[in-house]
C-alpha cells in the first residue's frame, strides 16, 4: 500500500471511533476539534469547513497545504460557503468582482433518514469555465428531499488565482485542480464522522466541474479516493479545458497589474504575490475581447514533470491510451444543444441590432476565441479553418437570427459533443472499468441560454445545464419543475445514489440500464427524453 493509501486508511479508522454525537447530530468531532452544523428540518448541514490553509500571502500560487489549525472553541459550521474570488460572468454591471481569496472549504449536507445509519457520498465539483461559479450556486433541496446520499460541495481556486501558469516549475499552474484533489482526500479521511461511507464516494461535476472530474480520474491512484466518477457536459478533451498559450497569458497578466519588469517566471510569481488578489482577478476583463469571450482565458495546463505536486504532466489522450489512470466506472453526458451556453449571447438585442450581426465582419477575428484554437494554429491556418467551419455549417448564409441554429450546432459540436465522443472512444478502447454515456433532449422552460440572450421568444432547444439543474437547483431556472421534470429529477438523483453504492459499477436511469462501452464496436448511448429513456447504438454521436 502506498503512502496516500496508508494515511487514508489510518484516518478512516481514527474517525470511525470519533463519529458525531448520537444525542446531538449537529455536533461532530474532527481532528481539528468539534464543529456544530445546522438543522434544516429534513436534513443537516455542515458548511464552510476548511480543508486547506488559506491560499493567501506566501501560499498564493502554491499547491494547497492541508488545514492544520486546531479549534479551541466549537467551530461554527452554519455559514454559507463564500465564492472563491472571481470575475463572474453572471454578475450584472461593469464590476463583476465577487468572492474571497480565502475560500478553500467543503460543505456537507446529510439527509434525515431513520432507515439508514450511514450513507453513500456524492462529492460535487461546481462548473463555471474554471473562471467563476460557487458551491452555493448549486442547490441541494432536491437531493435532500430524496434522502439517498450525503452531498459534499467542494470550493476551489478559480481564474488566474487557480490556473495562471508559466509552464515551468516556478509557476506550474493547476492550483484549482490540486485544491480539488486535497478536498477529495479530506472527504475520504473525514466523511465517516458525518455518517458517510468513505468506501462509497462518487465524484461528479458539470461543465468545468465535469472536466475536473475527468482530470482527477486521470490520476492512477484516483480509485483510492472515489469508487466512480460522473462527468456531465464536460470532459478532459473539450478544447477549452487543457489549453496552450498559458505562459504568454501569465506574463500578460503581469503586465496588466504592473509586473512588466519581470524577466522570468520566478520574478513574475514574486511580483504577482505582492499584488492584491482583487487587482489580479479584475485583470481578467483585459483578456475578454467580446462580452465574456473567451469564456475560459485561464484553465488547466500541462505541467512540467519536475513541477512540485504536479497533477497533469501528459496530454489526457496519452494518459488514457497508457491505461495508467483511475480504472473506476465512469459516465459522461451531453445535451443536444450544449453549445447554446456559448452562442446564446449572440442573440442579445441592442439598439443597433442583434449581437450576431457583428460576426459578419468579425468572424475570422472572433472564431478562434469562441472555439479555442487561437494558440494552436498559425494566423493563416486559423483563418482557413474559420472559413471552412462556417461553410460546413452555414454554407453561404450570413450570420443572423435565421442561421443562428446552425451556429449553435457548430458550437455544440466543437466545444462539447465531438470531444465527448472522442473521450468515450478512448475509454472503450483502453479502459478496463465500465464507461457509460447518455444524451439528454428535453428543453427547460427557462435555462442558461435565455438568461444570456435576455430573451424568451427563441427556442434554443435543450441547452447546457437543462439536465443538471434538475438535480441541483440553479438561479437560471426561476420556474417550478414540470411534472415530467420532477420524474426526471428523481430518476437522476436515484441514479447517482445507486452508482455511489454499487459494488459492480452498474448504472441505471429509471427502468433503463446503461450499457458498457468498453470493448464495444459501436457507441452505447442512453437517450433520455421527456417521457422515458432508450438504449441506442451509434457509429457516431447523433
Curated annotation (Swiss-Prot):
Biological process per Gene Ontology, one example term: pheromone biosynthetic process
Glycosylation sites: 40, 418, 454
Record-annotated disulphide pairs: 84-103, 259-271, 512-533
One Pfam family it belongs to: COesterase
Active site residues per record: 207, 464
Primary localization: secreted
Chemical reaction(s) catalysed: a carboxylic ester + H2O = an alcohol + a carboxylate + H(+)
GO cellular component: extracellular region
Family annotation (InterPro entries): AB_hydrolase_fold, CarbesteraseB, Carboxylesterase_B_AS, Carboxylesterase_B_CS
EC number of the protein: 3.1.1.1
Protein's job: Transferred from the ejaculatory bulbs of males to the female genitals upon copulation, plays an important role in the reproductive biology.
Assembly and binders: Monomer.
Name of the featured protein: Esterase 6
Gene (name only): Est-6
Amino acid at each position: 500500500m502506498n503512502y496516500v493509501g496508508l494515511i487514508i486508511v489510518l484516518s478512516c479508522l481514527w474517525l470511525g471511533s470519533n463519529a458525531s454525537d448520537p444525542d446531538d447530530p449537529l455536533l461532530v468531532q474532527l481532528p481539528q476539534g468539534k464543529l456544530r452544523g445546522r438543522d434544516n428540518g429534513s436534513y443537516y448541514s455542515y458548511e464552510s469547513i476548511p480543508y486547506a490553509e488559506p491560499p493567501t500571502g506566501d501560499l498564493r500560487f502554491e499547491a494547497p497545504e492541508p488545514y492544520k489549525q486546531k479549534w479551541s472553541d466549537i467551530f461554527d459550521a452554519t455559514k454559507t460557503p463564500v465564492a472563491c474570488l472571481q470575475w463572474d460572468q453572471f454578475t450584472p454591471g461593469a464590476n463583476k468582482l465577487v468572492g474571497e481569496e480565502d475560500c478553500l472549504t467543503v460543505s456537507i449536507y446529510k439527509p434525515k433518514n431513520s432507515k439508514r445509519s450511514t450513507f453513500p457520498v456524492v462529492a460535487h465539483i461546481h462548473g463555471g469555465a474554471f473562471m467563476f461559479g460557487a458551491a452555493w450556486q448549486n442547490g441541494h433541496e432536491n437531493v435532500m428531499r430524496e434522502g439517498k446520499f450525503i452531498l459534499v460541495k467542494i470550493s476551489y481556486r478559480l481564474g488566474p488565482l487557480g490556473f495562471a501558469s508559466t509552464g515551468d516549475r516556478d509557476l506550474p499552474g493547476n492550483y484549482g485542480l490540486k485544491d480539488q484533489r486535497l478536498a477529495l482526500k479530506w472527504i475520504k479521511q473525514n466523511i465517516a464522522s458525518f455518517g458517510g461511507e468513505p468506501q462509497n464516494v462518487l465524484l461528479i461535476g458539470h461543465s468545468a466541474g465535469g472536466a475536473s472530474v475527468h482530470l482527477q480520474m486521470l490520476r492512477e491512484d484516483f480509485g483510492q479516493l472515489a469508487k466512480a466518477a460522473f462527468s456531465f457536459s464536460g470532459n478532459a478533451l473539450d478544447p477549452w479545458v487543457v489549453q496552450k498559450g498559458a505562459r504568454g497569458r501569465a506574463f500578460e497578466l503581469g503586465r496588466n497589474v504592473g509586473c512588466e519588469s519581470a524577466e522570468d517566471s520566478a520574478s513574475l510569481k514574486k511580483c504577482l504575490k505582492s499584488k492584491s488578489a482583487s487587482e489580479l482577478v479584475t485583470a481578467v476583463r483585459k483578456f475578454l475581447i467580446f462580452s465574456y469571450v473567451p469564456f475560459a482565458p485561464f484553465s488547466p495546463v500541462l505541467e512540467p514533470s519536475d513541477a512540485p505536486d504536479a497533477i497533469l504532466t501528459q496530454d489526457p489522450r496519452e494518459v488514457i491510451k497508457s491505461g495508467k489512470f483511475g480504472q473506476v466506472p465512469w459516465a459522461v453526458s451531453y445535451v443536444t444543444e450544449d453549445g447554446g451556453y456559448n452562442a446564446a449571447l449572440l442573440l442579445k438585442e441592442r439598439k443597433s441590432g442583434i449581437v450576431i450581426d457583428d460576426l459578419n465582419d468579425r468572424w475570422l477575428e472572433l472564431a478562434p476565441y469562441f472555439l479555442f484554437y487561437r494558440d494552436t494554429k498559425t494566423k493563416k491556418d486559423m483563418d482557413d479553418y474559420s472559413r471552412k467551419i462556417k461553410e460546413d455549417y452555414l454554407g453561404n448564409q450570413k450570420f443572423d437570427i435565421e442561421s443562428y441554429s446552425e451556429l449553435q450546432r457548430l458550437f455544440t459540436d466543437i466545444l462539447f459533443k465531438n470531444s465527448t465522443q472522442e473521450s468515450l472512444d478512448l475509454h472503450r478502447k483502453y479502459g478496463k472499468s465500465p464507461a457509460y454515456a447518455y444524451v439528454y433532449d428535453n428543453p427547460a422552460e427557462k435555462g442558461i441560454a435565455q438568461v444570456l440572450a435576455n430573451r424568451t421568444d427563441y427556442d434554443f432547444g435543450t441547452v447546457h445545464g437543462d439536465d443538471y439543474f434538475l438535480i441541483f437547483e440553479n438561479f437560471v431556472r426561476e420556474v417550478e419543475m414540470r411534472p415530467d421534470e420532477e420524474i426526471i429529477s428523481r430518476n437522476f438523483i436515484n441514479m447517482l445514489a445507486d452508482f455511489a453504492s454499487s459494488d459492480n459499477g452498474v448504472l441505471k436511469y429509471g427502468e433503463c440500464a446503461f450499457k458498457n462501452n468498453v470493448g464495444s464496436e459501436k457507441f452505447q448511448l442512453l437517450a433520455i427524453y421527456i417521457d422515458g429513456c432508450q438504449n441506442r447504438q451509434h457509429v457516431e454521436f447523433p
